[in-house]
């Protein structure tokens, strides 16, 4: 009874208040989380912490707005009534390109450094968004699917530098014991990007015109590229600070750097890295099956103006922030910086949520259930892709480790795009929410397999030769 009452109350509010509420909620959640962040003292000076903030904030904001230049496709789809088949095809080829690109871009980031590759990501993705915007100015027809798929795939190639870059840069700036909290920060950045991508893009499409969802993100990305060039540095020493040993998998490794093939072999023969990669395959499947398809479900079934769909980006942002911080704090302070237990618990939430969605498709509760599921899956992604990759790859090999793990995330994304474009209802059949029963049925097996795999790394912990922090 509570959900319908809240929906009716929201519908009766004046427009200005409906616009203000999401912003206030978002600011409140961010303030709550920031003030509650645990302090892990590993001996960093105040000057070091200040310079580190100036380092990760620009690169983090760049990563967030890369999300806006990635998930804006959903807003464009809904604005121009693109078919599920065309949307799934474009999304699938973008995801495949993103996943496979890590085979090249992971080692390349280890070689070039995260500062250079975040610039490549921002400038390249910005240029491809401009190209998609120019194509969109000519109007959408289904025969443009191939061209959009090609441009979106090129966009996703440049996008793939983003995650590797942010983890590569921060691997040298964060001690192992600080990284659970950093995993929470990683979740915040992902979540802010989702807010921009879904809520801002929808408002841009409705308030200006659909092609502008591809023109606004490049403007922001190009400005942030300038900030990255000015402030971001790969290591503390490059920024005039003292380097330190983060006590990760690279600790004590002072020999010459391994070649790309040797590093890849080391990563691919690590049972822990392979299990984490497999878990993240299902994370990619579930994350995008929820985030991308719930707005499509809401529009098709006529509920797009109710509270959850109308504020989807804000709710994803809040869920992601809380999920990321909760996962990071529990990992560091309950499980001794082990990532597997938290991933297992969150996957359990995903499995339970799939069952609840199956029995609530026709009611207002389904939106809130998928918000909670988003909290769980963003928490897993930040914990494993953003944190475990640093732990087990080490700062010297983190590019390859992230490449393997995030590559699997986007292969999972491609699998969901290929699966859901065929099994979900389209056209008039999509108007009946009960015809969407295939949606939770597709989610449940992925959640179960991810849970079983996550339990395999319950006790996994990175090891290296300890050294004193500065």
What is each stretch, according to the model?
Residues 70-75, 270-325, 381, 413-420:
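Extracytoplasmic gate region of multi-pass secondary transporters
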Residues 123-141, 348-362:
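C-terminal ends and interior cores of transmembrane alpha-helices
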Residues 337-387:
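C-terminal transmembrane helical hairpin of 12-TM major facilitator-type secondary transporters
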Residues 64, 128, 143-161, 365-383, ...:
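Hydrophobic core of transmembrane alpha-helices in multi-pass small-molecule transporters
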Residues 42-49, 239-275:
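Juxtamembrane intracellular "pre-TM" segments in multi-pass secondary transporters
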């Amino acid at each position: 009874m509570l959900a319908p009452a809240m929906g009716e109350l929201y519908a009766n509010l004046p427009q200005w208040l409906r616009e203000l509420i999401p912003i206030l909620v978002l600011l409140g959640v961010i303030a709550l989380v920031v003030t509650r962040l645990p302090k892990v003292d590993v001996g960093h000076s105040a000057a070091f912490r200040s310079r580190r903030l100036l380092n990760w904030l620009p690169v983090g904001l760049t990563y967030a707005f890369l999300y806006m230049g990635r998930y804006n496709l959903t807003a464009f789809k809904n604005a121009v009534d693109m078919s599920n088949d065309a949307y799934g095809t474009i999304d699938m080829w973008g995801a495949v390109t993103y996943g496979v690109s890590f085979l090249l871009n992971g080692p390349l980031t280890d070689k070039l450094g995260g500062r250079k590759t975040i610039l490549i990501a921002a400038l390249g993705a910005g240029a491809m968004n401009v190209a998609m915007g120019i194509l969109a100015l000519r109007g959408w027809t289904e025969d443009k699917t191939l061209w959009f798929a090609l441009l979106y795939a090129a966009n996703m190639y440049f996008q793939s530098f983003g995650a590797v870059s942010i983890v590569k840069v921060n691997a040298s700036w964060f001690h192992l014991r600080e990284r659970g909290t950093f995993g929470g920060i990683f979740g915040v950045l992902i979540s802010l990007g989702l807010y921009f991508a879904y809520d801002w893009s929808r408002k841009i499409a409705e308030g200006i015109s659909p092609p502008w969802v591809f023109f606004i993100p490049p403007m922001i990305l190009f400005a942030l590229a300038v900030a990255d060039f000015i402030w971001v540095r790969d290591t503390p020493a490059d920024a005039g600070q003292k380097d330190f040993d983060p006590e990760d998998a690279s600790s004590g490794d002072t020999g010459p750097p391994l070649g790309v093939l040797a590093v890849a072999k080391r990563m691919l023969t690590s049972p822990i890295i392979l299990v984490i990669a497999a878990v993240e395959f299902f994370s990619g499947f579930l994350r995008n099956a929820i985030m991308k398809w719930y707005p499509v479900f809401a529009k098709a079934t006529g509920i797009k103006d109710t509270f959850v769909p109308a504020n989807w980006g804000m709710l994803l942002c809040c869920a992601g922030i809380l999920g990321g911080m909760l996962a990071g704090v529990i990992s560091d302070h309950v499980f001794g910086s082990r990532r597997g237990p938290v991933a297992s618990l969150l996957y359990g939430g995903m499995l339970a949520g799939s069952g609840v969605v199956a029995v609530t498709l026709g009611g207002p509760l389904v939106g809130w259930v998928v918000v909670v599921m988003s909290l769980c899956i963003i928490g897993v992604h930040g914990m494993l892709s953003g944190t475990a990759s640093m732990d087990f790859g080490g700062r010297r090999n983190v590019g390859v480790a992230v490449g393997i793990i995030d590559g699997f995330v986007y292969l999972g994304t491609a699998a969901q795009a290929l699966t859901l474009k065929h099994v979900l209802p389209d056209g008039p059949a999509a108007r009946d929410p009960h015809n969407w029963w295939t949606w939770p049925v597709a989610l449940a097996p992925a959640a179960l397999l991810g849970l079983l795999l996550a339990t395999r790394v319950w006790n996994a912990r990175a090891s290296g030769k300890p050294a004193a922090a500065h």
